[in-house]
Amino acid sequence: MRRIFFTIVLLLSVFNMTIYSQVTDAEKTLRTKLADSTQGWKRGGVFALNLAQTSLTNWAAGGQNSFAVNGMLSTFANYKRGKTVWVNSLDLGYGLLKQGNLGYRKTDDKFDFLSKYGHEAFKNFYYAALFNFKTQMAPGYKYDDAAKTKDLISDLFSPAYFLLALGLDYKPSDHFSAFIAPVTGKITVVSNKTLSDAGAFGVKPGEKSLSEFGGYLRAIYTKNDFKSEFLKNVTFTTKIDLFSNYVKNPQNIVVNWETLIAFKVNKFISANINTQLIYDDKIKVPVVRNGEATAIGSLVQFKEILGVGFSYNF
């Protein structure tokens, strides 16, 4: 009887060790798969198209017919392997408005490509290099409806901004990163002769580019996994770029701050609020007082776009 008992105990021990070994191997395999899933390329993006129309016929209260369309494409392709991280993004935006008998006029125009390559230095910090290129895709005009004239104020590659920065990238989580670059080169290009001859966007009259050397900071925060029931379909992204020219007026910091809030109604319908604030002391705009342009100076520029329409994530 005792021999049978010890035999049963021995068999159970062997069986238990076999099961434990299988579970351990399964856990190792699962951990390996999870680790591999965070490595390599990750790609995606969102496309949004917003439309607005007003049509009036014999409307006693008055008003004008109008039609507006605004499109946005934001894509990314990110790579991670070991201690190496490579982040790439492309943001495009374009909008048109037709009101009354006036022709179509541009309301938005954006081309923004960014690439950042980093290698882990220590926990949450990466040695990094960043390249950024910004321009627009179509001419921009200042309209005088009374005189029925328009003046060219911007165009493709007028301006265009090239920025190359070397520094340290702080990334404590998937939601936030701050890139600090004490070594940064920035080139502003104005390829249109009419605009460059006028000294637009900070270039000297007659010259087509402006080179600057300074310090750069880029911080970005994005979140789409809010726990609140009210915010569960909301995506929030805000990013700010700061540049200081070491050589000339370093206290005059160039600011570019963008925020996007997207409310997902269902798979294909969403509402978006997009804002952008710019300050650059080299960009001169009309100073308007009492409805009249009285001077030319450096002012804070602000743009806000609110749209409801079709959206598709991929």
Region annotations inferred by a language model:
Residues 49-55, 81-83, 92-98, 133-139, ...:
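Transmembrane beta-strands of outer-membrane beta-barrel pores
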Residues 106-214, 295:
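Outer-membrane pore/translocation modules
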Residues 300-314:
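Outer-membrane beta-barrel "beta-signal"
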Residues 58-63, 97-103, 148-154, 201-207, ...:
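Extracellular loop and loop/strand-boundary signature of outer-membrane beta-barrel proteins
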Residues 45, 49-51, 71-79, 113-119, ...:
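Residues on the lipid-exposed face of transmembrane beta-strands in outer-membrane beta-barrel proteins
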Residues 32-41, 78-86, 120-128, 175-178, ...:
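Short loop/turn motifs that connect adjacent beta-strands in outer-membrane beta-barrel proteins
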Residues 43-47, 86-90, 127-131, 162, ...:
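Transmembrane beta-strands of outer-membrane beta-barrel proteins
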Residues 17-46:
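Sec-dependent signal peptide cleavage junction
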